[in-house]
Amino acid sequence: MAKQKIRIRLKAYDHRILDQSAEKIVETAKRSGASVSGPIPLPTEKSVYTILRAVHKYKDSREQFEMRTHKRLIDIVNPTPQTVDALMRLDLPSGVDIEIKL
């Protein structure tokens, strides 16, 4: 029989909230008896937006804004039913995007 694995990808703009959420997930999974690998930091995605400061002319005067998306990967190997139930009841901050693959 093949090993079961739950793969959780977390995304957030703030890395502190992301790390706190990852620690909550790892702690919950370990408490319920599953083995955990991670959190693995994935490359940070950086989007840069350049806009003109002036409305009408002065093209040389520009302003740049950037948005960084931090990502983490957590693998839960051989999860028990208690692990899945505990993860479903876990309350995480609203700034974290969670993607779960079974």
Swiss-Prot record:
Keyword rRNA processing on entry: no
Highest taxon of the lineage: Bacteria
Cystine residue pairs: none
Gene Ontology cellular-component annotations: small ribosomal subunit
InterPro entries named among the record's database cross-references: Ribosomal_uS10, Ribosomal_uS10_CS, Ribosomal_uS10_dom, Ribosomal_uS10_dom_sf
SUPFAM superfamilies: Ribosomal protein S10
Record-level Gene Ontology MF annotations: structural constituent of ribosome; tRNA binding
Gene Ontology biological process terms, A to Z: translation
One Pfam match: Ribosomal_S10
Keyword tags: Ribonucleoprotein, Ribosomal protein
Entry-linked PANTHER family: 30S RIBOSOMAL PROTEIN S10 FAMILY MEMBER (PTHR11700)
Family: Belongs to the universal ribosomal protein uS10 family.
Function: Involved in the binding of tRNA to the ribosomes.
HAMAP family documented for this protein: Ribosomal_uS10
Description of how the protein assembles with itself and partners: Part of the 30S ribosomal subunit.
Protein name: Small ribosomal subunit protein uS10
The species this protein was found in: Bacillus subtilis (strain 168)
Gene behind the chain: rpsJ
